C-alpha cells in the first residue's frame, strides 16, 4: 500500500515538470566593440534626409544618451572616444533583444513599432530601415 502514494507523487511531479514553462538558458550575445566602432558609430554620424545627425544632439551634455564630441576638425571618433561611446551606448540595449532596447525603439516611428518618447524625431520609419538593421545586428551580437 505504501508504494501507491509514492507513485502518485512521482506522477504529479512529472506532470508539473512537463507543464512548466521552459526557460531559455541561452546567454545574451556579447556586444562586439569592432562592429560598434565601424558600423554603429557610422549611423550616429550619417546625415539622414529631413533629420539632423544623431551626433549633433547627442553630443550635448543635457542628453541622457551622450556621445563624445568629435575633436576639432575630426570626422570620426578616436579610440578613447569610441570606447566611451561604446560604454554609453551599451547601457541602452538589451543584448539579443532589439525590440526592448531603447537605442532602437526610441528613434523608431510609433507606426513602425517604436516608442513615442523620443524628442529627437523619428530617425527610422520602420524596422526595414538599413540603419535600424545595423543597430539591431549589433544588439544581436553580430561581429565584423
Describe the predicted segments one by one.
Residues 19-144:
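Aromatic- and Gly/Pro-enriched helix-to-coil junctions and flexible linker segments
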Residues 1-10:
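Bacterial N-terminal signal peptides that target proteins for export
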Residues 9-18:
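Bacterial N-terminal signal peptides
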